[in-house]
A protein has these predicted regions:
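Conserved ATP-binding subdomain of kinase catalytic cores across diverse folds
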Residues: 1-138, 142, 154-157, 176
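Phosphate/ATP-binding catalytic cores across multiple sugar-kinase/actin-like superfamilies
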Residues: 148-162
Length: 185
């Protein structure tokens, strides 16, 4: 079927990410917390995708926070209630997403965008760095875009092959493999 991307990682390192650990600079206006219900869904979905050979992040662990103080409106019908808190530890070779490049673009900061691009290429796509020195291609931006677009296409094809439908396809959920399973069908 499909290669078990992103694990194992040929670069030899992995990134960890905590879902539900609390407020961070990236929490936007939310509280940065997660409930058990969505955390179990995240864990099960990522492991199911992996078992089906679909490119995905993996869930390394799932833990309860020990409190019932996370307020969520499960059906968005105005009836929020307290739910048990949880934390999922995700593992992946890379958590940079399409949306990661939106911040420097919104700030109109090309230097920051270039710094992020150089970091991503150096750490996650080193084979593109050598190709970028050709006179006709001074930036690895286009080769990176093409490779990630191809990887994303293969991932979406793998979803379709197993009948998976991701419920939210925004830029913070696009990486070239499956990530963030908070809503799916």
């Amino acid at each position: 079927p499909f290669p078990p991307y992103p694990l194992p990682n040929p670069a030899g390192f992995y990134e960890l990410q905590l879902k539900g650990a609390g407020t961070t600079p990236y929490s936007r206006f939310a509280d940065g917390r997660a409930v058990l219900r969505s955390s179990v869904r995240e864990f099960v979905a990522s492991e199911a995708m992996h078992s089906l050979g679909v490119p995905t992040t993996r869930a390394l662990s799932l833990a309860l926070t020990g409190d019932r103080s996370v307020v969520r409106d499960q059906f968005y019908d105005g009836r929020a209630r307290l739910e048990p808190g949880a934390v999922v530890c995700r593992v992946s070779p890379c958590f940079v997403r399409f949306g990661s490049f939106e911040l420097p673009a919104a700030r109109e900061d090309p230097a920051l965008a270039r710094k992020l691009l150089d970091f991503v290429v150096e750490k996650h796509y080193p084979h593109l760095a050598a190709a970028s020195f050709a006179p006709s291609n001074r930036s690895p931006g286009l080769p990176l875009l093409l490779e990630v677009a191809e990887r994303t296409g293969r991932t979406v094809a793998a979803w379709q092959a197993c009948g998976f439908v991701h419920g939210v396809l925004n830029t913070v959920r696009r990486t070239g493999f499956s990530v963030r399973f908070s809503i799916f069908f």
